[in-house]
Amino acid sequence: MKIDAPRKYVTDNLKYALDPGSIAVVGASRYPNKVGYKVIEGLQKWGYDGKIYPVNPRADKVAGLKAYPTVMDIPDDVDLVSIALPAHLVKMVLEETVKKKAKMVVIATSAFKEIGRGD
């Protein structure tokens, strides 16, 4: 996806970051001490009333919610994708996110430069 007017894109779509109707949590974990679990737990605890889609190829459920193997397997539209994965997996997930036509992405990972990657 090439964005010709990035500022306009952000202002037009900021609502999807601040008040998304649905959130996919990529890297959702069954383990309560992991970031991918904490994201879902926080959303549930703080009363988020939109749809939450845990994404984990090795789990059927995460935090009581049906899990999906990939972003592309989610049957509905996704407003926000939260990525809680190691840096080497982020590019692949971003490509899926673009194909899914998600509106916004939040990435929580090690900084690429810190691990010797400049991409």
Locations of regions flagged by a protein language model:
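Catalytic-core regions of core metabolic enzymes
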Residues: M1-D119
